[in-house]
From Swiss-Prot:
Protein name: Phosphoadenosine 5'-phosphosulfate reductase
Name of the gene encoding the protein in the UniProt record: cysH
Catalytic activity: [thioredoxin]-disulfide + sulfite + adenosine 3',5'-bisphosphate + 2 H(+) = [thioredoxin]-dithiol + 3'-phosphoadenylyl sulfate
PANTHER family per the UniProt record, alphabetical: PHOSPHOADENOSINE PHOSPHOSULFATE REDUCTASE
Keyword Cytoplasm annotated: yes
Keywords: Cytoplasm, Oxidoreductase
One GO location term (cellular component): cytoplasm
Entry's family note: Belongs to the PAPS reductase family. CysH subfamily.
UniProt cross-references to Pfam families, sorted A to Z: PAPS_reduct
Organism of provenance: Proteus mirabilis (strain HI4320)
């Protein structure tokens, strides 16, 4: 089977594109995570990248991908507001997994943003979305362009939130192929993989955090809360990168 061509797919009608991807996804649903990665490396365009927020379970996808493609560029969008433990976790995994880390940031610093706009994350859903556009979406778009990405791997999982429960393994996002190798994994599989390969959870896992982003929009999980409610004051789940 030849490599999938995005240029050929975009010539198809929307319905034909959907049908083509549906057929492929039916096959990918039957594969294991590692088989999906191997399939993608063999059949998708070969400017590969992996994005990571270095969140609670980030070590899984970082290990899974780099064992098959050691030099894959790993994109981090750094807002400047990550937890100190997150920066330490980034350093730890970059060293232990020998990551080819590529860090992208907003064009203006976090302090300058606050001087210009105030604390956007306290300005309701519109403020949060503007903050995400400046600090997450725009840097990611720059990364994908500069790295000439044709295939984008990410560690999203259906179990993480209602907004993710119908995600396909393979899709087209931001004009490139996007593959989610562990999309159907549950928390038990995550735990087993980390244990099997002697990989760490994010340090804040032990303190009761289920999901970790910026210090100002991340809450520790409490009884009765959903995972979605631990981020962005429960107003939204996604930071804009995967919407």
């Amino acid at each position: 089977m030849s490599r999938l061509s995005l240029s050929q797919l975009v010539l198809l009608s929307i319905e034909e594109q959907r049908l083509a991807l549906d057929e492929i996804n039916q096959q990918l649903e039957q594969k294991t995570a590692i088989e999906r990665v191997i399939w993608a490396l063999e059949h998708l365009p070969n400017q590969f990248v992996l994005s990571s927020s270095f969140g609670i379970q980030a070590a899984v996808c970082l290990h899974l991908l780099t064992r098959q493609y050691p030099d894959i560029p790993v994109i981090l969008t750094d807002t400047g507001y990550l937890f100190p433990e997150t920066y330490q976790f980034i350093d730890e995994l970059t060293s232990s997994l020998q990551l080819n880390l590529k860090v992208y940031r907003a064009e203006i610093s976090s302090s300058w943003q606050e001087a210009r706009y105030g604390k956007l994350w306290l300005q309701g859903i519109e403020g949060i979305e503007r903050y995400n556009q400046i600090n997450k979406v725009a840097p990611m778009e720059k990364a994908l362009k500069e790295l000439q990405a044709k295939t984008w791997f990410a560690g999203l999982r259906r179990q993480q939130s209602k907004s993710r429960e119908h995600l396909p393994v393979l899709s087209i996002a931001k004009g490139i192929f996007k593959l989610l190798p562990i999309v159907d994994w549950d928390n038990k599989q995550i735990y087993q993989y980390l244990k099997q390969h002697n990989l760490p959870y994010h340090p804040l896992w032990e303190q009761g955090y289920l999901s970790v982003g910026d210090t100002h929009t991340t809450r520790k999980w409490q009884e009765g809360m959903s995972e979605e409610e631990t981020r962005f004051f429960g107003l939204k789940r996604e930071c804009g990168l995967h919407e």
